[in-house]
Amino acid sequence: MKGQQKPSDLFFDLDRTLWDFDLNSREALHAIFEELAAPILPASLTVAHFIDVYEVENEKCWRAYRAGELTQSELRPLRFQRTMEGLGIPAFKEMHSLADSMGEAYVKRAPYCTRLIPDAIEVVRTLKERGHRMFILTNGFDEVQHIKMKNSGLDPFFEIVFTSDAIGHKKPHPEAFSHCLNQTGSIPRHAVMIGDDLECDVIGALKSGWRQGHFNP
């Protein structure tokens, strides 16, 4: 139809936008705490307290990772090592070994958790039916983000999953956004970034000339 506006190309963040990172992470942490940590750590330490401290330290590590101060391989065990320190547990050899084991177990377990943000499937299905091309643009690790997509049922709705690992740049770096345009043939005025992170998703997209949708439930 003459004059009909082309449907926007929608680029979704994954964690905390579609995939319920907090609930899935806590489910995985609860399981690995009971399996690996509870037999070793003081009986007075509850899983709830462990998770509370972990979430604080994990966010600090992710900020450092996004700033280029940590590598992926450094982040995975370090967030658990710092959790132990935050709990006041002495940093002796066994604790470093436990932190390494928990880091490996978490990455193996968490991606297979399947809780989504409420109504996520219904929303992306409706958008797909309306003719939007849809993609994922995430700072998460390549190997785990694809597992999340497949196991949670999101995969069929998205043409390409772009990860910072594969791109070589993390949001909000402009190269992350320009790479997506180059690969999809989209242009800034047709591209919309939808995500929960104000700095990475919204401001990053704004600086690249994209439209933005801030998911802030």
Q: Each PLM stretch: what is its role?
A:
Residues 2-56:
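Active-site neighborhood of HAD-like aspartate-dependent phosphohydrolases
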Residues 56-104:
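A metal-dependent, Asp-based hydrolase signature
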Residues 25-36, 54-58, 80, 103-110, ...:
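Hydrophobic alpha-helical core bundles mediating ligand binding, dimerization, or RNAP-core interactions
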Residues 6, 73-77, 92-100, 104-136:
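Short, acidic loop-to-helix structural element flanking the phosphoryl-transfer center
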Residues 108-116, 121, 135, 140-192, ...:
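Substrate-recognition "cap/lid" segment bordering the active-site pocket of phosphatases
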Residues 190-217:
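Acidic, Mg2+-coordinating phosphoryl-transfer loop and its flanking beta/alpha structural elements
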